[in-house]
Amino acid sequence: MATVLMINASDRLEQGVSVKMYNQFLNSYKEAHPNDTVEELNLFAEKLPYYGNTAITGQYKKAQGVELTGEEKEIVETIERYQEQFLNADKVVFAFPLWNFTVPAPLITYLSYLAQAGKTFRYTETGPVGLVGSKEVALLNARGGVYSNEEMAALEMAANLVRTTMAFWGITQPVEVIIEGHNAAPDQADAIISEGLENVKKAAVAF
């Protein structure tokens, strides 16, 4: 039995294509792997505190054995709770849209919680080394425009951001399913989304 962490990074629960991808993957995975444990995490619903001075100072003080303020202690414990959940999962699925060239803010915050030396990577004399390379990861991304061509590729900072972050942590071959172009070609949107969701289903069964 595997533990699978399903992460939804969109609050467009009725209209969002990445949410449709999330739901398709979730249902198909459960059907194909009935004995696995699935944990769901909706990042917008979690209302994650921003990763800023309080969090950074609190983590530094804890590492140095210095007493934390109440506010620092609260956010450090929050960060550690999400770290533990991620690290304990055998498989992790990220479902997220591209909004204004990048990912929604809660996903940035969540990745910041996880991107901690000694947790997901460590420093060595020859450079940083990922610590979670054995974890299986799937990336489900929806983007209304077409960013797979050379002209637009440099503007794609959603899938590329998450993919690069995973690689830094040692996860170099995530499963990826991308649905793109449904807003750019509305007359083809249904077909584009339908084909993409079929690819999501296949990925879930094989994951």
Swiss-Prot record:
<keyword id="KW-0560">Oxidoreductase</keyword>
<keyword id="KW-0288">FMN</keyword>
<dbReference type="GO" id="GO:0016652">
    <property type="term" value="F:oxidoreductase activity, acting on NAD(P)H as acceptor"/>
</dbReference>
<dbReference type="GO" id="GO:0009055">
    <property type="term" value="F:electron transfer activity"/>
</dbReference>
<dbReference type="InterPro" id="IPR029039">
    <property type="entry name" value="Flavoprotein-like_sf"/>
</dbReference>
<comment type="function">
    <text>Also exhibits azoreductase activity. Catalyzes the reductive cleavage of the azo bond in aromatic azo compounds to the corresponding amines.</text>
</comment>
<feature type="binding site">
    <location>
        <position position="10"/>
    </location>
    <ligand>
        <name>FMN</name>
    </ligand>
</feature>
<comment type="similarity">
    <text>Belongs to the azoreductase type 1 family.</text>
</comment>
<dbReference type="InterPro" id="IPR003680">
    <property type="entry name" value="Flavodoxin_fold"/>
</dbReference>
<protein>
    <recommendedName>
        <fullName>FMN-dependent NADH:quinone oxidoreductase</fullName>
        <ecNumber>1.6.5.-</ecNumber>
        <ecNumber>1.7.1.17</ecNumber>
    </recommendedName>
</protein>
<dbReference type="Pfam" id="PF02525">
    <property type="entry name" value="Flavodoxin_2"/>
</dbReference>
<dbReference type="GO" id="GO:0010181">
    <property type="term" value="F:FMN binding"/>
</dbReference>
<keyword id="KW-0285">Flavoprotein</keyword>
<keyword id="KW-0520">NAD</keyword>
<dbReference type="InterPro" id="IPR050104">
    <property type="entry name" value="FMN-dep_NADH:Q_OxRdtase_AzoR1"/>
</dbReference>
<comment type="subunit">
    <text>Homodimer.</text>
</comment>
<comment type="function">
    <text>Quinone reductase that provides resistance to thiol-specific stress caused by electrophilic quinones.</text>
</comment>
<dbReference type="InterPro" id="IPR023048">
    <property type="entry name" value="NADH:quinone_OxRdtase_FMN_depd"/>
</dbReference>
<dbReference type="GO" id="GO:0016655">
    <property type="term" value="F:oxidoreductase activity, acting on NAD(P)H, quinone or similar compound as acceptor"/>
</dbReference>
